[in-house]
Amino acid sequence: MYIKTQDGFADGDLANLERLLKIVDDELSTIDGLIRESSDPDSEGLFDRGEYMTGVALTAIQQYIGSTYSQFKINRAAALRLAPNVNHGLTLVSVLNAGANYWKHQDEWGLRAVVTRDVELLGSQAQQTIKIIESLTPWSDYTCSNLISSLVGNGKVRLMALVPQLILWRQEIDLLNAEIS
């Protein structure tokens, strides 16, 4: 939840999210170093470790998104359509939401569908999630990490780089709330 002040915003949820994302980014930096030193980072589980951290961070971002728009009479669909846009008519928060849903639910989609990457075997919500993700990165190994890398644009998986964009989105929420209040 945030409060609008004379100087801007007091946003305790964002402050908590930033603390978490910094911890995750620090861990991802450590993992990157271990990957560079390793002769077989895949067998050592280093890629999986990074993917896990990234997936957990996506769910924290999703929680921030939900706690921000839900304090007003703004529905989820409208909140997910607000700028900033990333590409193909998609918004940053819709992509982050899809990434979080992917992380949380992929294990429920059935082993065959996930291993073969057969979208036709998925339910409609899962298909929509994959469609959004594939607008930025292929559905493949380490999908969450690849998604963040494509959003950040520098080839790195660093989640703090998303915070300025989330702040822009929060400003859009505030503008929409002012319009409907």
Residue ranges and their predicted role:
Residues M1-G45:
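Charged alpha-helical initiation segments
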Residues G8, G12-A15, R19, Y52, ...:
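Alpha-helix boundary/N-cap detector
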Residues E18, K22-D25, G55, T59, ...:
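Generic structural signal for well-ordered, non-transmembrane alpha-helical segments
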Residues G33-P84, L90:
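Short, contiguous, well-structured surface segments enriched in hydrophobic/aromatic residues
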Residues I65-R76, K104-L111, N177:
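Long, hydrophobic, amphipathic alpha-helical segments used as structural scaffolds
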Residues P138-S181:
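A hydrophobic membrane-anchoring alpha-helix module
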